[in-house]
């Protein structure tokens, strides 16, 4: 919003942003072989159905789950799957929703007194609002701060100081992404000319909300002493192991013709055994990096869930076996939210992001990537949007604004 819409852009007369709307389908005119997108049907926040008509083109940008879902709800997709849920197939496009790719990661958690950042320090650095009830010790209503006990008053003052430090100097813990270091390398299992692995260094552990809400893991199953490990002053670090060129492919499949029903997201993680082989190699490299950490800043022993440690005879300080690493990957891998390739270029869209077989319809998001990138997808997704805008301008004879270089 801040980068692309805020200010003059959102005030333009040719831009209307409709909040709370849910696109239900692309409106198609014509017979097979002569299909054209003429608008999008959507439901408003009030539940009313409306149509936004297109003078020139419709551009979908709903992501690697949403874009193929909208295409299929519009009748563009694998014929047998559409007919199975009662959607009239307007264009048999077998690859819509297929070839789903994503990055997986496994976090290796290490106690790191004096090195890692505690969750308490993280909360303090995010300012007073992050410390308010119900989750924090400060009152929910700032008006009640006048009667704070001395200790809580000092806590609030320090939180304000840290936010001010960041706002005025750009320094301080709040300026950190927490993902403080990264490494890319080749495991040697794939193409030697490209990297297939990534390591990340996360300078704090996870709190209980992240364990339960994001990772879907019960901390009492991962730790012998969850209260100690998740205490606000516990200092930990996480080394994230990411294979970045997975071979396994999943798919997006409609569960019904109702646009408000979530599609079936079949990730098929580790469906190709090669991906597990690479994950073990990446974990092994991560362990090697930690084992060779500079002496004054050594991390504690790797924390392994008690049940897996007992099953594999692992004791703190041991070198984990490959079988243990496989089990850790199977039980504790989690998504990096890098879903791509479900409307991929070459089989669903052409080199200018136009949907094959339909005039006036493009897709511009991570779903058009032929394969997932060998690293984070955020910058690539932004680039796709920028390039799509450029292509639209070129194809419709709209002059592009000159790029003004910033002064050196």
Give the residues covered by each predicted segment:
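Short beta-strand to alpha-helix junction loop
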Residues: 1-10, 18-20
């Amino acid at each position: 919003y801040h980068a692309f819409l805020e200010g003059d852009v959102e005030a333009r007369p040719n831009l209307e942003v409709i909040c709370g709307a849910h696109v239900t389908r692309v409106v198609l005119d014509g017979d097979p072989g002569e299909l054209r997108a003429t608008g999008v049907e959507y439901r408003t926040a009030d539940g009313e159905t409306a149509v936004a008509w297109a003078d020139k083109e419709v551009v979908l940008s709903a992501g690697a789950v949403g874009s193929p879902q909208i295409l299929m709800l519009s009748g563009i997709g694998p014929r047998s799957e559409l007919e199975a849920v009662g959607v009239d197939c307007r264009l048999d496009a077998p690859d819509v929703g297929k070839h789903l790719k994503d990055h997986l990661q496994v976090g290796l958690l290490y106690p790191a007194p004096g090195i890692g950042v505690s969750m308490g320090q993280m909360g303090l650095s995010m300012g007073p609002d992050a410390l308010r009830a119900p989750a924090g010790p400060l009152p929910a209503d700032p008006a009640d701060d006048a009667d704070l006990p001395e200790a809580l008053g000092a806590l609030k003052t320090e939180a304000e100081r840290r936010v001010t430090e960041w706002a005025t100097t750009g320094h301080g813990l709040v300026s950190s992404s927490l993902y403080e270091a990264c490494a890319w390398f080749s495991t040697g299992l794939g193409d030697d000319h490209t990297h297939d692995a990534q390591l990340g260094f996360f300078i704090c552990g996870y709190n209980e909300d992240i364990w339960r809400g994001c990772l879907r893991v019960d901390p009492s199953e991962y730790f012998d002493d969850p209260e100690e490990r998740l205490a606000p002053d516990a200092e930990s670090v996480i080394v994230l192991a990411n294979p970045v060129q997975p071979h396994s492919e999943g798919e997006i499949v409609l569960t019904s013709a109702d646009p408000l029903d979530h599609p079936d997201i079949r990730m098929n993680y580790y469906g190709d055994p090669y991906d597990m082989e690479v994950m073990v190699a990446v974990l092994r490299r991560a362990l090697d990096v930690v084992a060779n950490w500079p002496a004054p800043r050594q991390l504690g022993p790797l924390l392994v869930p008690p049940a897996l440690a007992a099953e594999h005879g692992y004791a703190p300080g041991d070198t984990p076996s490959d079988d243990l690493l496989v089990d850790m990957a199977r039980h504790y891998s989690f998504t990096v939210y890098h879903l791509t390739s479900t409307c991929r270029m070459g089989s669903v869209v052409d080199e200018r992001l136009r949907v094959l077989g339909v005039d006036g319809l493009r897709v511009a998001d991570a779903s058009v990537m032929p394969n997932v990138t060998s690293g984070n997808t955020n910058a690539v997704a932004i680039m796709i949007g920028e390039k799509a805008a450029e292509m639209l301008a070129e194809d419709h004879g709209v002059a592009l604004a000159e790029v003004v270089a910033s002064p050196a």
